[in-house]
Every structure is written in structure tokens, then in C-alpha cells.
């Protein structure tokens, strides 16, 4: 089953961006290559139950089993040792990526309280967009009664474009709600 956002990208966004950016080849048009979702857990070392609930929540949100990220070396100031669980991470590609991006744009972001749009300064200079969410309740897959604690997550949308302007044009064409469109 092809995703709705993927067919919209192929049929509408690609011809529009090809004309705007004046590319000769259709493969030069920027595209979303992957989405990385990271959820850091400070209390995972003391509470194994929080790690399990975060794994469950992230698998509900993404539809894919997350991996547990571990500390590379010991840091006494944070009271962690090497190989201790410090977070949960998921990398989405292909159809799962388009399904998540569609739900993020059309379901999750409009449910944020006092949402004014995404900040267009959150690009990293290489065409990748980063956003942070403060709670997981905005996703319809999460049941309010079954969560133990509100946890935020970092979402990185990696594009094939080499600069921020092309990536911003791509995400605006896909429907991402930015505060000021195309000011980069």
C-alpha cells in the first residue's frame, strides 16, 4: 500500500520543486531520506520500568521496534556507567517514514496546545530539520490512561538537499506548518 504523502510527493511536490529550483533531472529534486526519533531517559539507570514504557510508547507511535541506546563511557557527574541504558532511538525509512510524517503533520502537530508553527531556524546547515516535542500525548496512538510519565522526544528529518533553503521549500511543499514560510 503506497502512502498518501508519498504519492503526493511524487505527483505534486516533485514537479513543483523541479520547476522552482530549475533542475533538469527529476532525481536532483530534494527528498526526505529518513526520520530519526530519539528519546533520552535520564532515569533509565535507576528505573527499568521507565525504559520499558518508553519502548512501548515509541513502538506505538512509529510502528517499528526501537533500539536501546547505551552510554559509551562512564560519566560520574551524571551517575552513569559504560553500557548503561540512556535512551531509545528509532530510524524510519521508506513507507514507515512517510506514514509517520503524514501523522506528524496532519494529526500530532495540530494537537499541540498554543501551536504557532515550527521555527524555520531549526535547520542544521546541511538540509536537515530538527524539532523537539515536549510530550508524547499529541500522537493519537498513545492512550492517556496508560502512560506513566510525560516524555519528550527529538525528531530529526533528514533530507537529500545540501542547503537549508531547498529543505525548507521541500518541507513547506509537503505541508509542514512553519511560522514564517520561506524566509531562510
From Swiss-Prot:
Keyword field contains Ligase: no
Family annotation (PANTHER family): 60S RIBOSOMAL PROTEIN L11-RELATED
Gene name, Swiss-Prot/TrEMBL: rpl5
BP terms from Gene Ontology: translation
Family: Belongs to the universal ribosomal protein uL5 family.
Single GO MF descriptor: structural constituent of ribosome
Provenance organism: Zygnema circumcarinatum
Name this protein carries in UniProt: Large ribosomal subunit protein uL5c
Subcellular location: Plastid, Chloroplast
Biological function: Binds 5S rRNA, forms part of the central protuberance of the 50S subunit.
Principal subcellular localisation of the protein: plastid
Pfam families tied to this protein: Ribosomal_L5, Ribosomal_L5_C
S-S pairs: none
GO cellular component, one term: ribosome
